Amino acid sequence: MSAQISKLATVSDGAILGEGVAVWDFSKIRENSIIGDHTLIGDYVYIDINVSIGKNCKIQNSALLFDPCVLHDGVFIGPGVILTNDHNPRAISNTGAKKASTDWDKVGVEVFTGASIGAGTVCIAPVKIGNWAMIGAGSVVTKDVPNFALVLGNPARQVGWVGKKGLKLIPLDDSNFLCPVTNEKYSLSNGILSEMANK
């Protein structure tokens, strides 16, 4: 099954789209970007040059993903999310001259497997969003987010942990947590939450 591309979308000849990719109306995918198998791109999405997106991702309407961001497999990007690439943005240099593309160092956002970024969130590069982390809608992320962390607000702060199902985990004690639906257990050690061997 080849990619399904809306006639109203713009996809550069230099972009690589995997099997089963869907690109909806008025989205733009730039050259040298890579979109993994079965990823869905909503309406009015902008994917910059050199962006890498894994398999089975969902990029919702009006999201803006700037070079050099990387999304691993199974990432959810909500409507209106912005992944930035310039920590010190300026239109002109200190001399007043117009800045060229070589006048600044691009920095990126990296989103790891299974993570979700809620609608209207802005991630200020450089940041890394850990595996299965969840960012609440409307957040402004200014620092790295640990695996399974639940963060929200401006600036985004951690308010708990979530499991792979995306639900807030119930603390059993200071270092053990439980998913209220799947009964999967997680263990916290040195600030790192890990999934336990669930049987």
Regions of interest found by a model, annotated:
Residues 131-134, 140, 186:
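Internal alpha/beta core interface subdomains
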Residues 147-153, 162-171:
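Short, intrinsically disordered, charge-biased short linear motifs at domain edges
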Residues 158-161, 177:
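Cys/His-enriched microdomains
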Residues 88-90, 157, 185:
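Active-site/binding-pocket entry motifs
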Residues 4, 13-15, 22-128:
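Flexible, glycine/small-residue-enriched loop-and-beta-strand segment within the central core
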Residues 163, 179-182:
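Short cysteine-rich clusters marking metal-coordination/redox-active sites
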Residues 185-199:
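Short metal-binding segments enriched for Cys and/or His
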